[in-house]
Amino acid sequence: MKKLILGACMFMGAIGFSQDNGYFFGGLESNSQWLLDDEDFGFTAPEDQFRSNNYLQLNYTLGKFTAGVQYEAYLPTVLLGYSPTWENQNGIGTYYLNFKNETLDITGGYFYEQFGSGLILRTWEDRQLGINNALKGLRVKFTPTADLDITGVYGQIRNGFDVSEGVMQGVDANLDLSSLMKVDAIDLKLGASYVGRYQSNGSNDSIPSNVNAYGGRLDFVANNFYGGVEAITKDPDVIVNEGTVSSPQLFDGTALQVNLGYAQKGLGINSTFRRLENFSFYADRYAEGNVYNEQIVNYVPGLTKQHDYLLSNIYVYSAQPRLLFNDTEKRAGEVGAQVDVYYSFDKESTLGKLGTKIAGNFSYWAGLEATYNDAEQTYDAKFIGDGDRYFRDLNIEVKNRWSSKWSSIATFQDVIIDKGVA
């Protein structure tokens, strides 16, 4: 398939000017393509060859108030590969009004929010991926002291130019323990989150109307070491696959993520362990597993190296948090880890004079080892076990700067991926 890009980002970024103590700012982004026939791939261009996604954002700030609106047009039709939800649509996508002072930050309308690492809640916009799951409702942030902040949200997740059937609510709190206890040797922060979804079950009382998730986290920095742990549990809910309830049983979900790292001049080490069991979360239970990530509540990225070059990025891993329990496929989630090591040679050394930098990465992700009881529709998963391997990547990168005009990058990569899953 061949594409002629007519205007990838006509212009994107901030434009602004002030007037009578107020301030306007915003931006325009236009991404267009013209699809052509490609005989080599047997691709015939659709009737709507010209496609365009366009975004116009305008904001105005006056004193402690800020208001904004975003107009979107997917005309004459949306770019190929985006959700049909946007097909031939245009109109006001988002709008908001915000008030902010030293202790209060209140937003009504559409807003974006993240609790912790995003494992329990993250709403965001990514135009390149066609994702916009902004919350429409009310957000209140309260910062009574420098050591404590509390955020409350209530609303519905955006779905195209509409909103989700499910109603979301949540509370997040962060406490600076080191400051509170006047401890200087270590930076210690404690966080707790709650996110709930209400969605009518119609006349089916076996489906819960309310599904809640609860999480806690602890982060630290001590000298050159840093780390954190976040654990979340989600109430039992039905399993949905392709818009249909696939099991009469209810299953709870859990998530655990642990980070540990070390940093000093010339050396950095970062490691992450994560275990997800039945931990997908959507504003509409029937949206679970949709390929466009519409109405998704939390953020569960694949924790692997983001390579610089296209050839390496052919092998992309997507996280597998879902529980699938049917005749053709059974899996309960994923478990794995990633380690990054960065090293820069001292500038006075031979390699340091060449600007030599070495980066190494290893990641391994597998399914949870579990036993399944088809008759009773139950399963039992081990904490780690020896589940099927989904993805493994070992890579080393060496960068040199030989002169002001010449530099080189040498990369070794050994990757295994199960494309049937990842």
Where on the chain are the PLM-derived regions?
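Transmembrane beta-strands of outer-membrane beta-barrel pores
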Residues: 30-36, 62-64, 71-77, 101-103, ...
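Bacterial Sec-dependent N-terminal signal peptides
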Residues: 1-25
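Short glycine/proline- and aromatic-enriched beta-strand/turn motifs that initiate or cap beta-hairpins
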Residues: 19-45
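Short loop/turn motifs that connect adjacent beta-strands in outer-membrane beta-barrel proteins
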Residues: 18-24, 60-67, 99-103, 107, ...
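Outer membrane beta-barrel
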Residues: 59-61, 65-157, 260-285
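Outer-membrane beta-barrel architecture
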Residues: 57-59, 68, 95-98, 139-141, ...
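Hydrophobic, small-residue-rich alpha-helical packing segments that form membrane-like cores
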Residues: 131-214, 219-222
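Exposed, low-structure sequence patches enriched in small/polar residues
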Residues: 29, 47, 51, 183, ...
